[in-house]
Every structure is written in structure tokens, then in C-alpha cells.
Swiss-Prot record:
Homodimer. Gene3D superfamilies: Aspartate Aminotransferase, domain 1, Type I PLP-dependent aspartate aminotransferase-like (Major domain). Belongs to the class-III pyridoxal-phosphate-dependent aminotransferase family. HemL subfamily. SUPFAM superfamilies: PLP-dependent transferases. Its EC number is 5.4.3.8. Its cofactor is pyridoxal 5'-phosphate. It is found in: Cytoplasm. It comes from Prochlorococcus marinus (strain MIT 9301). This is Glutamate-1-semialdehyde 2,1-aminomutase.
Length: 433
């Protein structure tokens, strides 16, 4: 494949950015700290491709970190947004589009009987934690090592995503009193969860988790794990919360809860439901959601929540995803991709394990299996950095961290998958030397 070597404009712009913004970025993982090399400054995106400011084209497997499941700048989404923006960018008042997207979410997601829109996944998780505590009258919450639920103080305990990427301890500036009620357990370890319930009787409001971990790499639930959490929370009078900001509408139309047949009490959403615009949501049983203001006493608000542009993009995206054969195509393409990646590594004598579920995939450069965050950290970080740089030179844009899942879209074709596997063949051959 043709090597990309010219990053002159990206270098200039990123250098200037470091004088203007902390680290030169608006979100830490974009700085390429864990992989080295030159952060790329994008100019435009379309379909499965991204172009940088120097004119280099990449096959993109980040997809704006998950929202672009239909491909970047899908023409139907763009047309709908053009029509919507003529009416104004934000109303700060009720909007019929909120009703329509709410109906679509409620119809699709098994646990959701009522939904509240916010502006990000972090907001959704902050609000859902407050709601859990209010509904149960309990303060403690269980989260899992490596699972990421946004950057709110109470979740920055053994967190994934950028916290894991940068190898940071629990963040400075977060008082111990804030996280004193946050309990942690290894993902896929039911016994550890049982122990926490035993040690904290009648004190745990609920358990929150990514049903498929996407922010500590790509880690799937062991058989019986999600079912076991459902049983444990019910037995202990606690709530089960699925953070489906990443998996919602990505691994099936009804998310992970539909895919695995386990229904939580509450769900957080984001990414896909905004069609590429800032959005978040949380929802669940009416009995619980009726506690949210102004219907109930649990306060939460937002200036741009439910804005017409995000609602428009979300509605059109879900309409596209609901078409027949959508997830069969995503399953097939992504399976082909990860199988090719694994085969390429094995052909070059490089330890690897990985997998995919529909339009979400990931791999670790280590002996497997990887069932939790501690095992994920056995990934060969130095080798992954070399791989990332080699793939970038060949026009393949992967997440610049081993602790982030990858994403395919409906815009990817077999041609892009084949070119990507070819690039992996060449890159693995290069880094094994």
C-alpha cells in the first residue's frame, strides 16, 4: 500500500494548538500519547473515509468514537439537518422532534419506558447515578475496573478510556469523600460482586457497567455474567444499569440488552442516537423515571438538551439502522475484519486475541484470553504503538490506544476491509523485525 509521509500541516497546526489548549486537544486520547507519532488534524470526513489537512486519506475505524455507524456525513442525515437548521439551531423549549426520537428509543430498547435527553454520555451517567441513589435511598454504587462512565468525579475510580490510555491514577482534584461510596470489582467476576453486596448490606444503590467493555479495549461478558448481575441486584433490592452509550444501537437495534437478553432497570445512551451531534440520554422504568424533575424531586436540566439538530440527526440515523439487513451486514463485515487481523498477526508470529460483536471490535497484542482490565493491561503497549504508526502510514486510522474499541459502519465495504487486512499484513511483518 502507498505510504503516507507528509504531515507538514498537521504538525504545524498541532504545534500551535499546544499553546492554545491543554495538550493541544479537546479530549486526551487525540494527542497520541500512548502510541507516539504525529497526531492527525482532520479536514473532512465522508462515508468510511477521513482526510487530514495535508490531503491524506484514511479508512476510518474510529467513526467519531462511535456515532458514525451509517458512515460519515450520510447524505440523508445531511439533508435532514439542512432542513432542520433553517428553523433554528436550538429552541430551549419543547420540540416535537423530542417526542419522535423518544418514541423510537422506547420502542427499541427493552428497559426504556421513559427517557430524558441530555448532551453527553457523561451527563447521562451523572444523572442516572443521582436517580439510582434517590430511588433506592442508598448511597453506594458498584462499577467495574476499566469501565468508563464519563469524567464525572464519582466515576473516576479505576476508570477506562483516556484515563487508562494515559496510565493515570484516580484523577487529582477528586476528593476521597466523593468516591468513598464508589465500590469497584473486576469485570466478569461475579464472586467479587457478591462479596461487595455481603460487606455492604442494604447500602448499595446499584451496579453500573458497560455490558461490552469498549473503554478498556474490547472485552465481552462471560456466559452468565450479565444474568448473574441481574439476579444479584434483584435479590439485594438494588438497580442494574447498563451504560449503552457505546453499545446502544451499535451491536443490535435494541443494544446489548436485546443482544444478550438481559434487561436492566436503567440505561444510558449517547453516540449513535445523535447521529454525530452531541447527545446523551437515560431511561428506564416509568416508576423510576417519574422521579426526575419536574415530574419528581430528582433535579437535572440542560440548556441544549433535546435540541432540534441532535434530535433530527438521531431520528434519521435510527431510521436508516432499522432497515432490513442492516445488522447482518455489520456482523459480516466486522467478523471478516477481525478474523483477518488475527490471521495476519498469527502468520507473523505475533501474539494476539480479539473479537467482534456486530459493528464493534477490538484486539490485544498479548496471550489471551482477556476477560478484565488487569488482563487487558498485559497488552504489549510498545508493539501496539509501532503497529498504530505503521497502519497510519498505510492510510488506516485506528484508535490511538489499545484501550479503545474499534468501529465499523454501513459505509465500509469489502474493498475497505480487504485493504485494511492487507495493511495489517504489511504492518505486522514490519514490526516483527
Amino acid at each position: 500500500m502507498t505510504d503516507i509521509l507528509n504531515y507538514t500541516k498537521s504538525e504545524e497546526i498541532f504545534s500551535a494548538a499546544q499553546e492554545l489548549m491543554p495538550g493541544g486537544v479537546s479530549s486526551p486520547v487525540r494527542a497520541f500519547k500512548s502510541v507516539g507519532g504525529q497526531p492527525i488534524v482532520f479536514d473532512r470526513v465522508k462515508g468510511p473515509f477521513a482526510w487530514d489537512i495535508d490531503g491524506n486519506r484514511y479508512i476510518d475505524y474510529i467513526g467519531s468514537w462511535g456515532p458514525a455507524i451509517c458512515g460519515h456525513a450520510h447524505p440523508e442525515v445531511i439533508t435532514a439537518l439542512h432542513e432542520a437548521i433553517e428553523k433554528g439551531t436550538s429552541f430551549g423549549a419543547p420540540c416535537v422532534l423530542e417526542n419522535k426520537l423518544a418514541e423510537m428509543v422506547i420502542d427499541a430498547v427493552p428497559s426504556v419506558e421513559m427517557v430524558r435527553f441530555v448532551n453527553s454520555g457523561t451527563e447521562a451517567c451523572m444523572a442516572v447515578l443521582r436517580l439510582m441513589r434517590a430511588f433506592t435511598g442508598r448511597d453506594k454504587v458498584i462499577k467495574f475496573d476499566g469501565c468508563y462512565h464519563g469524567h464525572a468525579d464519582m466515576f473516576l475510580v479505576k476508570a477506562g478510556s483516556g484515563v487508562a490510555t494515559l496510565g493515570l491514577p484516580d484523577s487529582p482534584g477528586v476528593p476521597r469523600t466523593t468516591t468513598a461510596n464508589t465500590l469497584t470489582a473486576p469485570y466478569n467476576d461475579l464472586e467479587a460482586v457478591k462479596k461487595l453486596f455481603s460487606e455492604n448490606p442494604d447500602a448499595i444503590s446499584g451496579v453500573i457497567l458497560e455490558p461490552i467493555v469498549g473503554n478498556a479495549g474490547f472485552i465481552t461478558p462471560e456466559p452468565g455474567f450479565l444474568e448473574g448481575l441481574r439476579e444479584l441486584t434483584t435479590e439485594n433490592g438494588s438497580l442494574l444499569v447498563f451504560d449503552e452509550v457505546m453499545t446502544g444501537f451499535r451491536i443490535s437495534y435494541g443494544g446489548a440488552q436485546e443482544k444478550f437478553g438481559v434487561t436492566p432497570d436503567l440505561t444510558t445512551l449517547g453516540k449513535v442516537i445523535g447521529g454525530g451531534l452531541p447527545v446523551g440520554a437515560y431511561g428506564g422504568k416509568k416508576e423510576i423515571m417519574s422521579m426526575v424533575a419536574p415530574a419528581g424531586p430528582v433535579y437535572q436540566a440542560g440548556t441544549l438538551s433535546g435540541n432540534p439538530l441532535a434530535m433530527t440527526a438521531g431520528i434519521k440515523t435510527l431510521e436508516l439502522l432499522k432497515q432490513e439487513g442492516t445488522y447482518d451486514k455489520l456482523d459480516s463485515l466486522t467478523s471478516r475484519l477481525i478474523e483477518g487481523i488475527i490471521q495476519s498477526a498469527e502468520n507473523n508470529g505475533i501474539a494476539i486475541n480479539g473479537g467482534s460483536v456486530s459493528a464493534m471490535f477490538g484486539f490485544f497484542l498479548c496471550d489471551g484470553p482477556v476477560r478484565n482490565f488487569n488482563e487487558a493491561k498485559t497488552n504489549d503497549a510498545e508493539l501496539f504503538g509501532k503497529l498504530h504508526r505503521e497502519m497510519l502510514r498505510r492510510g488506516i486510522y485506528l484508535a490511538p490506544s489499545p484501550f479503545e474499541a474499534g468501529f465499523t459502519s454501513l459505509a465500509h465495504s469489502e474493498e475497505e476491509i480487504d485493504k485494511t487486512i492487507e495493511a495489517f499484513d504489511e504492518s505486522f511483518n514490519e514490526i516483527k523485525k
